[in-house]
Curated annotation (Swiss-Prot):
The keyword Mitochondrion does not apply. Disulfide bonds: none annotated. The gene is hemL. This is Glutamate-1-semialdehyde 2,1-aminomutase. It comes from Helicobacter hepaticus (strain ATCC 51449 / 3B1). Its cofactor is pyridoxal 5'-phosphate. InterPro entries: 4pyrrol_synth_GluAld_NH2Trfase, Aminotrans_3, Aminotrans_3_PPA_site, PyrdxlP-dep_Trfase, PyrdxlP-dep_Trfase_major, PyrdxlP-dep_Trfase_small. GO terms for molecular function: glutamate-1-semialdehyde 2,1-aminomutase activity; pyridoxal phosphate binding; transaminase activity. GO terms for biological process: protoporphyrinogen IX biosynthetic process. It comes from the Bacteria. It catalyses: (S)-4-amino-5-oxopentanoate = 5-aminolevulinate. The modification N6-(pyridoxal phosphate)lysine is found at K266. It holds the Pfam family Aminotran_3. Homodimer. The keyword Isomerase applies.
């Protein structure tokens, strides 16, 4: 595969952009090789600057549930742009979008739009601390909630890729208010509550997507809700990745556990910079200008991003079999990958919910970040490189999640499985030839 233009682009980018990328995982640091510089996408496929075609399971890290260059979204954007790019004033579309999110998800009474998942979780934490008049928070090792200082502690993919638990530049005076519990371990959460009597909230990805794909156990989520009530702490469920990905009602719908506050992003923006946080009205009404908790943004509720979000949600609403179709494809993919690996006695753990999936080169089921870290990342890197050379674009880290889009079909999935089986065969042959 010729990737000369990507090599040249990457070298040029590194001269003016730190690491050559604007988000670290894109640099292929954990899998090796040269990141592909993408020129365009259509449906299930992306094309690099050398015009190589790839089946794309990254889908912009989750937002593109209908695939690349969706015509309905493109049309909505084209119309919106003609009316102006940004006003810094309220628009009817903002209210319409928020109503759609609330009605479809059933997860909040009121909601505010922001520009990124990091903004959403950061704002939700500030609000929870103000509401409870407490300072400490509990998060889970391996869960990623953006790069705000309070949450950049044991943060999964963004840090796990580089083997560091946090980041330089994050003051201890801030992180001392963050307690870290073990995912799927309710007793570790209780221990955090016993350690601090000043816990404002617990924040969690019910479907963890940044330690690889690791779903929470249903009983764990139910016990977590009860524990938050017992200790008078708010429960924040981070649906930035899983919202409208795992199903119409996201992870909250799968677990039947109500959050006090919830965050959204990715799908609700349809590929544009858009996120949201919401929850009970009595909590949300503490936000300025109604209450005293300050939160603001020049481009919050940007009409172009809102138009893309509306076009996405209205398509979801009009397609009642969407999530069933996506999950059928996801299950077909992970079943095929596991069987392909087994045929060469390569251990592979797989799982999916809705259109989210993941796999680990691991001997045992992965239930938390400790389990995930025991995975064979060298094997993942070899697999990733070889699949990329065969035109399959998986997430470039063992500690990330994959995504199915509606533009995919059984033929595409079967093609990927066939290529994976060939790759497992190549890897096995290479290993045996060295013995």
């Amino acid at each position: 595969m010729d990737i000369l233009q990507s090599i040249n682009d990457f070298n040029e980018a590194k001269q003016v952009i730190p690491g050559g990328v604007n988000s670290p995982v894109r640099a292929f640091g954990s899998v090796g090789g040269t990141p592909r510089f993408i020129a365009k996408g259509k449906g299930a496929y992306i094309y690099d600057e050398d015009d190589n075609e790839y089946i794309d399971f990254v889908q912009s890290w989750g937002p593109l549930i209908f695939g690349h260059a969706n015509e309905v979204i493109e049309s909505a954007l084209s119309l919106a742009i003609k009316d102006g790019l940004s006003f810094g004033a309220p628009t009817e579309k903002e209210t319409t979008l928020v109503k759609q999110i609330i009605a479809l998800s059933g997860s909040a009474e009121k909601m505010r739009l922001v520009n990124s998942g990091t903004e959403a979780t950061m704002s939700a934490l500030r609000l929870a601390r103000a509401y409870s008049n407490k300072d400490d928070i509990i998060k889970f090792e391996g869960c990623y909630h953006g790069h705000s200082d309070s949450l950049l502690v044991s943060a999964g993919s963004g840090c796990a890729t580089f083997g560091t638990p946090s980041s330089p530049g994050v003051p201890n005076d801030i992180t001392k208010h963050t307690l870290v519990a073990r995912y799927n371990d309710i007793e570790s959460v209780r221990a955090c509550f016993e350690q601090s009597k000043n816990v404002a909230c617990v924040i969690i990805e019910a479907l963890a997507g940044n330690m690889g794909f690791v779903p929470a156990d249903k009983k764990f989520m139910q016990d977590l809700r009860a524990l938050c009530d017992e200790y008078n702490a708010l429960l924040i469920i981070d649906e930035v990745m899983s919202g409208f990905r795992a199903g119409l009602k996201g992870a909250i719908g799968l677990y039947d556990v109500q959050a006090d506050l919830v965050t959204y992003g990715k799908v609700i923006g349809g590929g544009m910079p858009l996120a949201a946080f919401g929850g009970r009205a009595d909590i949300m009404d503490m936000l300025s200008p109604v209450g005293g908790v300050y939160q603001a943004g020049t481009l919050s509720g940007n009409p172009i991003a809102v138009s893309a979000g509306l076009a996405t949600l209205l398509q979801i609403k009009a397609n009642p079999t969407l999530y069933e179709h996506l999950e059928v494809l996801a299950k077909r993919l992970i079943k095929g990958l596991k069987e392909a690996a087994q045929s060469y006695e390569i251990p592979l753990q797989v799982d999916c919910r809705g259109s989210m999936f993941g796999f680990f080169f691991n001997q045992k089921e992965v239930k938390n970040f400790d389990d995930a870290k025991c995975s064979d990342t060298a094997m993942f890197a070899r697999f990733h490189q070889k699949m990329l050379d065969k035109g399959v674009y998986f997430a470039c880290s063992q500690f990330e999640t994959g995504f199915i889009c509606s533009a995919m079909n059984e033929m595409i999935i079967d093609e990927v499985i066939m290529k994976a089986k060939a790759v497992f065969g190549e890897i096995t042959h290479e290993i045996e030839s060295r013995i």
